[in-house]
Amino acid sequence: MGQRGISLKLAFSLALAGALLAFPADALEWKWSYQGEGVAASGTLITRDRPNADGFYEITGIKGEANGVAIAGLQPPGTSIPGNDGYPVDNLVRTEAPQLSLHGFGYALANGTYANPFYGAHFAKPDTYAFASDPTNHKTSEPAVTFTATIVR
């Protein structure tokens, strides 16, 4: 085997190792989206690979966009997104309806706004809602949304 063959094998091995390290073996990847009045969001969630006793998987990572703005990061569980104090997220999702918990998951957007989709069982019309806040401009919204999430690997 020539030097070129060894270099190609080494490059392939390094690329494969990098891919395996980038996606933990104990994680699942989900495709998710929601749409409602004035909002459309979608992307990828990374969760632990085992559900809790209620069938919920803990979300550990997020990528995507909302209304064309990139998602900058996941809100830590047990904390509230800015502008929604008193409503901490738990970052849980499951395969069966309702797919989100009462606390839902939260994320920051690159433009300084935040979102928290959740299942509002306590609302007059139980449904999935997406609380959105723009702390800089003191604006919030909470439309009902259609949420879907599916495990892809």
Name every feature range the model reports, one short phrase each.
Residues A22-P24:
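N-terminal signal peptide c-region/cleavage motif recognized by signal peptidases
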Residues I6, A15, K31-W32:
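Generic detector of short alpha-helix boundary/capping microenvironments
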Residues G2-F12:
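Bacterial N-terminal signal peptides that target proteins for export
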Residues L28-R153:
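Mature extracellular "passenger" or substrate-interacting domains of secreted, surface-exposed proteins
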Residues A11-L20:
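Bacterial N-terminal signal peptides
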